Amino acid sequence: MHIGLTHYVVASGILFAIGLAGIILRRDLIVILMCLEIMLNAANLALVAFSRFNANLLGQVLVFFVITVAAAEVAVGLALIVALYRVKHTTKAEDITMLKF
């Protein structure tokens, strides 16, 4: 069985849908952050697949930049969640309604 571009795009779409469903359905900020990372990894998978099957390495280079930005996003996101937890003692998205501490 030959694994083609369609298989990778379908897998990427499924991962993206799982991440989107997690963001919509869950209310915990840490879970929302993890689901956002799943969505970014789905986009990375699609970029690498298109890059591989079109014999162009620019998509793979772009993935390295996306991974770098995602790592910075996780660091800032977790720092914000920890700061909010110290003040509000919760990580539920609906409990955090004020824009300032």
Curated annotation (Swiss-Prot):
Signal peptide per UniProt: none
InterPro entries, A to Z: NADH_UbQ_OxRdtase_chain4L/K, NUOK/Mnh_C1-like
GO biological process entries: ATP synthesis coupled electron transport
EC number: 7.1.1.-
Catalytic activity line of the entry: a quinone + NADH + 5 H(+)(in) = a quinol + NAD(+) + 4 H(+)(out)
Membrane topology category: Multi-pass membrane protein
Domain of life: Bacteria
Gene Ontology CC annotation, any one: NADH dehydrogenase complex
EC primary class: translocase
Regions annotated as coiled coil: none
Similarity comment: Belongs to the complex I subunit 4L family.
Protein name: NADH-quinone oxidoreductase subunit K
